[in-house]
Curated annotation (Swiss-Prot):
GO terms for cellular component: plasma membrane. Coiled coil: none annotated. Gene3D superfamilies: Ammonium transporter AmtB like domains. The chain crosses the membrane at residues 34-54, 59-79, 139-159, 164-184, 202-222, 237-257, 272-292, 297-317, 321-341, 355-375, 407-427. GO terms for biological process: ammonium transmembrane transport. Involved in ammonium transport. This is Ammonium transporter 3 member 2. GO terms for molecular function: ammonium channel activity. Pfam families: Ammonium_transp (PF00909). Keywords: Ammonia transport, Membrane, Transmembrane, Transmembrane helix, Transport. It comes from the Eukaryota. It is found in: Membrane. Belongs to the ammonia transporter channel (TC 1.A.11.2) family.
């Protein structure tokens, strides 16, 4: 009887396999894939559940769906053109060249951010281009979930009144003309990256952008129905807490994935993230008790978010004591702007920012960026940043200049998002109304989607033909 040799597919032939290149670090690749996945879980189901629970019952479906749609739409835009606009070859000081990230040759090859090579004044290379020890597909995945969560955060300012069709148009336009500019300028090798502005993992690129863009879009869309704006208690605080918990734990991937490697910077970033977040939550809760005599669960969630946001631009470049200080400030300054200043300011009152994204992300993100300019520790900076001898003002030397860079970087992100978001909203409004008609605002989910979050069919509820339309009456469902 003849025998034949067993052929093992290349992918399973150990380290000699074509699927395991010499440059591949399996540990780094595994960590980066896990980090990307938990960041994705922050959005789906994290923010989907949080948005669905924190709004009024009649807007639960619409709010959750705005988040889900944005997550899906960003994926397609990202791999088709937006990834390379953010991290590809340089086109302009603020933009990379638009091209697809779908080719096998690109995706299975070693990851590289070509525009990140940093030169000294004499033209010699100071820092080589970022080249993680895993495939480009991993970087595309990791950065996509960051882009997606940014759009979902913008949605938080617009819940309860923006036309869904307008939102469908807004997502790809804002990703293309706003997010990619911030990402390339600060991370992908643009002018702020090479100037030395520090944004460890998205305080400016993600949170300031989302807070300012959301606030600006909310101005152009207009307010919710008056009765929705006057009183809107969460329809399900436990859902809100579930989404918040996914956010907090998912931030380990958010900030832990920032160095593109499973290294000591990642460990420091994850620890600092939890220190700052816990302190911010406690401070916010204490302020609620002192001024309003009651500890608020929703307030605690807001304090948690401001802590997460504030530490993000600094997580891998500050010491633990600085994370504690940042937590105190993250729990108090955004609390003041949201709970006190907002009620006194006519400008802030005029704009209906549904979930207060301007405060929890815009203010907290800018605060974190500025504090990074104070507390960035030189040794940690040298482990991560392309510009040598970067340090916060607290450490003397060039630290004062660093603080100035942080101010300038924040102002650029604010100005760009105000201008571009306004232009996008004005352009969309030429095609479709930005705001739902009043009759849909009165009803909510049932009028917009023909669905409700808590339709108790088993209790004998009748199918409402005045809302859905029907050829014949529908009998009650018996469960």
């Amino acid at each position: 009887m003849s025998s034949s040799a067993t052929v093992v597919p290349l992918a399973y032939q150990g380290n000699t396999s074509a699927s395991v290149a010499d440059w591949l670090n399996k540990g780094d690749n595994a960590w980066q894939l896990v980090a990307a996945t938990v960041v994705g879980l922050q959005s789906v189901p994290g923010l989907v559940v949080l948005y669905g629970g924190v709004v009024k019952k009649k807007w639960a479906v619409n709010s959750a769906f705005m988040a889900l749609y944005a997550f899906a739409a960003v994926w397609i835009c990202w791999v088709t053109w937006a990834y390379n606009m953010s991290f590809g070859e340089k086109l302009l000081p603020i933009w990379g060249k638009a091209r697809p990230a779908l080719d096998q040759g690109l995706l299975v090859g070693r990851a590289a951010l070509p525009a990140t090579v940093h030169y000294r004044a004499d033209g010699s290379v100071e820092t080589a281009a970022v080249e993680p020890l895993y495939p480009m597909a991993t970087v595309v995945y990791f950065q996509c979930v960051f882009a997606a969560i940014t759009l979902i955060l913008v949605a938080g300012s617009l819940l309860g009144r923006m036309s869904f069709l307008a939102w469908m148009i807004f997502v790809p336009l804002w990703l293309t003309f706003s997010y990619t500019v911030g990402a390339f300028s600060l991370w992908g090798g643009g002018f702020l990256f090479h100037w030395g502005v520090i944004d460890y993992c998205g305080g400016y690129v993600i949170h300031v952008s989302a807070g300012i863009a959301g606030f600006t879009a909310a101005y152009w869309v207009g307010p919710r129905a008056q009765k929705d704006r006057e009183r809107f208690p969460p329809n399900n605080i436990l859902f809100t807490l579930t989404g918040a918990g996914l956010l907090w734990m998912g931030w380990a991937g958010f900030n832990g994935g920032g160095p593109y490697a499973a290294n000591s910077v990642a460990s420091m970033a994850v620890l600092n993230t939890n220190i700052c977040t816990a302190m911010s939550l406690i401070v916010w809760t204490c302020l609620d008790v002192i001024f309003f005599k009651k500890p608020s669960v929703v307030g605690a969630v807001q304090g948690m978010i401001t802590g997460l946001v504030c530490i993000t631009p600094a997580a891998g470049v500050v010491q633990g004591w600085a994370a504690l200080v940042m937590g105190v400030l993250a729990g108090s300054i955004p609390w003041y702007t949201m709970m006190i200043l907002h009620k006194r300011s006519k400008i802030l009152q005029r704009v209906d920012d549904t979930l207060g994204v301007f405060h929890t992300h815009g203010v907290a993100g800018l605060l974190g960026g500025l504090l990074t300019g104070l507390f960035a520790e030189p040794t940690l900076c040298n482990l991560f940043l392309p510009v040598a001898d970067s340090r916060g003002a607290f450490y003397g030397g060039a630290g004062g200049a660093q603080f100035g860079k942080q101010i300038a970087g924040g102002l650029f992100v604010v100005a760009w998002n105000v201008a571009v978001t306004s232009l996008i909203c004005l352009a969309i409004n030429l095609l479709v109304p930005l705001r739902m008609p009043d009759d849909k605002l009165e009803v909510g989910d049932d009028a917009v989607h023909g669905e409700e979050a808590y339709a108790l069919w088993g209790d004998g509820e009748m199918y409402d033909v005045t809302k859905h339309g029907s050829d014949a009456a529908v009998a009650p469902v018996v469960v």
